[in-house]
Amino acid sequence: MDKLLQWSIAQQSGDQEAIEKIGKPDPKMLEQLFGGPDEPALMKQAIMVIDNEEATLENREIAFDNFEMLIENMDNANNIENIKLWQSVIDKMSAETPTSLRVYAASCAGIAVQNNPKSQEDFLKYDGLASLISICNEEDVPTELRLKALFAISSLIRNFEVGYAKFDELDGWSVVKFNENEDHKVKLRILSLVSAILSTPLDKKKEEHVHREKLVANIISILKKDGHIGCIDKALNIISQLASSEFEFSSSEIGDIAQGLEEIEKLKDSISEDDYNSVKQVVN
């Protein structure tokens, strides 16, 4: 408050040196002082518009865009649960909802839970993970919606054992699908999901999934000299993660990894040196 008073006096006197020295006041403090709505109130207002089916789709999209910007702040992300807005967000993931709003809902979920243990726990109180998995398994799902849903799932389960356990319980592994002709953006999201899966301890049950889904073979298939650099980098990182978790590669897998490394030898200057060398240790 003292800083705000000093700023006000400097503004009135026109003392530029003092203004520069004091700096700008906290916008939140200005809002409180002059009676502007606080951010939780703005979040509630946005959700009211989003929930209103009589509002135009454009206005609902604008409201969701505003809501998304607000929850990029971690305090506001945590306030989604505090002011009981999660269910409204998750409801917009349903197949009956316009696609653009579903995209926003999945995106907001991913942003809110990313690197945020409290929001990860809060989100799991609802059926949002089941909705996200369902989106990824829809036939002819729009690519943008699938990307946002994969992002949200990855953000939810990364470094969060309880989140992974729920993912496993809901047959989340069903979304880990590799298609050689897939858009590289989708491949990157799936690889990020695999990385998130491996961010928690590799127990026997998880190892069984790795074998059943032929995960190692699918990852190795990405190591191509004409492949997308980002995907190759991520694939190497995942093999490195598996090695760090003391995963036992079969002799045929080790041979295929060695072949993959030869394939991308000329790309060494464009990919992570640490991951490349770590993977080389697997075959030596």
From Swiss-Prot:
InterPro entries: ARM-like (IPR011989), ARM-type_fold (IPR016024), Hsp70_NEF-Inhibitors (IPR050693), Nucleotide_exch_fac_Fes1 (IPR013918). One of its GO terms (molecular function) is adenyl-nucleotide exchange factor activity. Keywords: Cytoplasm, Repeat, Translation regulation. Functions as a nucleotide exchange factor (NEF) for Hsp70 chaperones which accelerates the release of ADP. Required for fully efficient Hsp70-mediated folding of proteins. Gene3D superfamilies: Leucine-rich Repeat Variant (1.25.10.10). The gene is FES1. One of its GO terms (biological process) is regulation of translation. The keyword Transmembrane helix does not apply. ARM repeats lie at residues 13-55, 117-158, 161-199, 204-244. It is found in: Cytoplasm. It comes from the Eukaryota. This is Hsp70 nucleotide exchange factor FES1. GO terms for cellular component: cytosol; endoplasmic reticulum. It holds the Pfam family Fes1. SUPFAM superfamilies: ARM repeat.
